[in-house]
Amino acid sequence: MSHHIDLDELTASERYKLLTALVIPRPIAWVTTVSSEGINNAAPYSFFNVFGQDPAVIILGLEHKADGTAKDTENNINLLNEFVVNLVLPTIQ
C-alpha cells in the first residue's frame, strides 16, 4: 500500500508533524554557538544528520521564528562560521 501526500497542501505545522514522525526515535543534538559579543548559545535540534565523511558534512535544519526571522543559532553560524554539534546519549533522560 502506498500513499501520496502533497506537502504543498499542508500547513507548516502539519508538515512538521509528518516529517518528525518519519524518523523515530529522533536523535537529539545540542548545537552550541557563540555570538559576536561572546555570548554562548545552546539550542536543541532534532533536524540534523550526517551526509558524508570525506568531506565530513553535517546538515542542520535551521527553523525560523514565527515572524520569519532567523534564530540566534543561525545568526551566530552566519556571523562566525562556527558551531559544535553535541550528541545526546540515549541514557540521558
Go through the PLM ranges and name each one.
Residues 1-93:
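N-terminal structural module
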